[in-house]
């Protein structure tokens, strides 16, 4: 399935039905009073978060959503039917903005979360409401009110426990394919991963966490170089960053510093997230390789996804980090 993480749509709630002009017509009551019913309300438009959805692809093909119009009022004080509501499913992690104002309307985070995005118009009153002592046979009724109408911009930010960060060919796709059932494209050239991939990593005792493979960052990504900020935003919602540097990198410390700099330029708050560093591709490490000391308080592990080296220790540490975040996100945000 094609991955799409931004889309624009228009939504239109239903107009309210018009009120009815009607008079009682019964045997022996030749001049009955007004009995026009009210119009039904227009249908509302809702957004509903659905964890089964992973892309905004559907909105590339359908860009307009219109709820049903309210039914018109009838005689004998019968109200028109309410218009049919429209419920639009979106992936968890979708941020919705009003195109005209730029205002963020909602952030759809929880599965099943639902919000009314456009309210249907109120139905008009029938002529029964306008009878008075001096006007006993009103020959008018209210029209229905128009439903709300908006242009919306949607942006998907993937929700994962662990975000993989590294230059192209750091081994991110290989790692996620080994630890989970995800099957990203893997090849020995830069930018093999062109879209984010999500994988569920199974841990002991039926525990699991979600890992996101973000397309490779290059220097200048925050300014739009390479794949640019198109996918950097997907790191924002991750709880823990797993920064990956290959063992055969000429200057591991410099590459690590560059990755942190790109994250900081995009969003300084990313550096407050817990992070773990892994030196990858240990199966092809130089003979004189030594483990680097990169930053005080940041753990560094060595792995080889191909040889299976260090993967158990990595899963243990990632689970520890994710568990801390799940227990007390605010307390451990900078740990």
UniProtKB/Swiss-Prot annotation:
Major subcellular site: cytoplasm
Gene Ontology MF annotations: GTP binding; GTPase activity; magnesium ion binding
Organism taxonomic ancestry: Bacteria, Pseudomonadati, Chlorobiota, Chlorobiia, Chlorobiales
Function in brief: An essential GTPase which binds GTP, GDP and possibly (p)ppGpp with moderate affinity, with high nucleotide exchange rates and a fairly low GTP hydrolysis rate. Plays a role in control of the cell cycle, stress response, ribosome biogenesis and in those bacteria that undergo differentiation, in morphogenesis control.
Residues binding GTP: 166-173, 191-195, 213-216, 280-283, 304-306
Cellular compartments per GO CC: cytoplasm
Species of provenance: Chlorobaculum tepidum (strain ATCC 49652 / DSM 12025 / NBRC 103806 / TLS) (Chlorobium tepidum)
Record-listed Mg(2+) binding positions: 173, 193
SUPFAM superfamilies on file: Obg GTP-binding protein N-terminal domain, P-loop containing nucleoside triphosphate hydrolases
Stated name of the protein: GTPase Obg
Known cofactor(s): Mg(2+)
Pfam family, one: MMR_HSR1
Domain Obg: 1-159
Keywords from the named record: Cytoplasm, GTP-binding, Hydrolase, Magnesium, Metal-binding, Nucleotide-binding
Gene Ontology process terms (BP): ribosome biogenesis
Positions of the OBG-type G domain: 160-323
Family: Belongs to the TRAFAC class OBG-HflX-like GTPase superfamily. OBG GTPase family.
């Amino acid at each position: 399935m094609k991955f799409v993480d931004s889309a624009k749509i228009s939504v239109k709630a239903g107009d309210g039905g018009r009120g009815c002009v009607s008079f009682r017509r019964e045997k022996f009551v030749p001049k009955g009073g007004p009995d026009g019913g009210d119009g039904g309300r227009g249908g509302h438009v809702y957004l509903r978060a659905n964890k089964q959805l992973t892309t905004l692809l559907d909105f590339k093909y359908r860009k307009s959503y219109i709820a049903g119009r309210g039914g018109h009022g009838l005689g004998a004080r019968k109200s028109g039917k309410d218009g049919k509501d429209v419920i639009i499913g979106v992936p968890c992690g979708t941020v919705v903005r009003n195109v005209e104002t730029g205002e963020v309307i909602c952030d759809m985070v929880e599965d099943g979360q639902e919000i009314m995005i456009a309210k249907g118009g109120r139905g008009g009153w029938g002529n029964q409401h306008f009878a008075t002592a001096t006007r006993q046979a009103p020959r008018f009724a209210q029209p229905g009110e128009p439903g709300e109408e908006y242009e919306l911009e949607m942006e998907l930010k993937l929700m994962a426990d662990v975000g993989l960060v590294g230059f192209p060919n750091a081994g991110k796709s290989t790692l996620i394919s080994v630890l989970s059932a995800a099957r990203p494209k893997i090849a020995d050239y830069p930018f093999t991963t062109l879209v984010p991939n999500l994988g569920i990593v199974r841990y002991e005792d039926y525990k699991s966490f979600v890992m996101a493979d973000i397309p490779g960052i290059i220097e200048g990504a925050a300014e739009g170089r390479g794949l640019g900020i198109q996918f950097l935003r997907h790191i924002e919602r991750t709880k823990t960053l797993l920064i990956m540097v290959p063992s055969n990198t000429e200057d591991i410390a410099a590459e690590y510093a560059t990755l942190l700099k790109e994250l900081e330029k995009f969003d300084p708050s990313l550096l407050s997230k817990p992070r773990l560093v892994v030196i990858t591709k240990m199966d092809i490490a130089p003979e004189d390789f030594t483990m680097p000391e990169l930053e005080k308080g940041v753990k560094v592990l060595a792995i080889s996804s191909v040889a299976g080296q260090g993967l158990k220790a990595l899963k243990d540490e990632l689970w520890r980090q994710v568990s801390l975040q799940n227990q007390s996100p605010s307390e451990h945000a900078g740990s």
